[in-house]
Design a protein with these regions (language model features):
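Membrane-anchoring hydrophobic helices of lipid-metabolizing enzymes
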Residues: 2-112, 145-146
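Catalytic core of membrane glycerolipid acyltransferases/transacylases, capturing the structured
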Residues: 92-156
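Structural motif corresponding to alpha-helix initiation and N-cap regions
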Residues: 84-87, 137, 160-163
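Short, flexible loop segments at the rims of nucleotide/cofactor-binding pockets, characterized by
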Residues: 73-78, 152-157, 187-189
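Short amphipathic alpha-helical segments and helix-helix/interface helices
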Residues: 70, 116, 141, 166, ...
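Short, structurally constrained coil/turn elements
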Residues: 76-78, 92, 120, 172, ...
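Non-catalytic C-terminal accessory region of glycerolipid acyltransferases
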Residues: 2-38, 160-282
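Conserved beta-strand scaffold positions in the cores of enzyme catalytic domains, especially
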Residues: 84, 126, 149-151, 209-211, ...
């Protein structure tokens, strides 16, 4: 169908208006979607990176369902995934923190397909927000709890378990996907400022950051929401190693800045325009 035949979704229009408002106000780390109310994740409710047989069975079922669901989205052209640029940068590392921009509920599965294509011998775990683990019902909740997820928590004791799991995941040569932008803005094309937590984890565990920035382009297709279906292209950068001759704060900031530089340079190269935000201060 053409865009004239499908009215644009009022919900999506409201989200875009909210994104524009938050950009003007510099509120880059705040979510714009109406997520379900969340609750605190307690330490006795989770065994991070659980390798018990029952957990492995749930993991296998969850990944099977997720792969089928994602395949169906691609078959129906609701998501169009293009060839990854720089795949060799991920194939050659052992443990690593992978960073990525966050713009779609399924972008972590875009990253799973990228990881699979790299032929990396280990697993990719993903850090998710607390409410995604505790409060999503049904099918999505099952995926959130069983697809190699490491949920954050507002409970201090749970966070201690989380950090121990991060150390184990990286020490075993696995990769850890983190969204340091912290917020998800639907199909937002610009890179957002990055929070420091991901870079602290890389520094503490002596592993590199492999930055990824996913660009998008309007296809000729129009989705059910009245907006053009996007063609997504993942761009992987060379591993960024911590400079351990620097103080920890300086080394962390260097990792963060180099990752931001990669995202900005990729944005400006692909879109052919300088990165500018419509903030009130600019």
């Amino acid at each position: 169908m053409t865009s004239q035949e499908i009215p644009k979704s009022p919900e999506r229009l409201a989200i875009l208006e909210k994104i524009a408002q938050y950009e003007r106000e510099g509120r880059f780390d705040e979510d714009v979607e109406n997520d379900p109310p969340s609750r605190v994740l307690l330490p006795e409710e989770i065994e991070y990176a659980d390798r018990r047989f029952s957990a492995e069975c749930r993991r296998t079922a969850a990944f099977g369902a997720a792969y089928l669901y994602f395949w169906n989205l691609r078959r129906k052209k609701e998501i169009i995934l293009c060839k990854t640029e720089g795949l060799e940068h991920l194939a050659g590392v052992k443990g690593a923190v992978i960073t990525c921009n966050h713009f779609h509920p399924m972008d972590s599965f875009i990253m799973q397909k990228v990881f699979d294509a790299s032929k990396h011998p280990k697993r990719m775990y993903r850090v998710i927000r607390e409410g995604n683990y505790t409060s999503f019902p049904g099918f999505y909740g099952f995926l959130m709890r069983n697809c190699n997820t490491l949920p954050l928590s507002s409970n201090m004791q749970t966070m201690k378990k989380f950090l121990r799991a991060v150390d184990w995941v990286l020490s075993e040569g696995n990769c850890l996907l983190i969204y340091p932008e912290q917020s998800m803005w639907w199909n937002y094309r610009k890179p957002k400022p990055l929070k420091p937590g991901a870079f602290d984890m890389a520094l503490k565990n002596h592993v590199p950051v492999v930055p990824c920035f996913i660009t998008m382009a309007d296809s000729d297709l129009v989705g059910g929401d009245g907006f053009p279906v996007q063609e997504y292209t993942p761009h992987l950068g060379a591993p960024i190693w911590p400079d351990e001759t620097l103080s920890r704060p300086a080394a962390r900031e260097q990792l963060r800045q180099k990752t931001e530089d990669f995202c900005r340079e990729t944005y400006e190269t692909v879109y052919g325009i300088p990165l500018r935000y419509e903030t009130r201060e600019s």
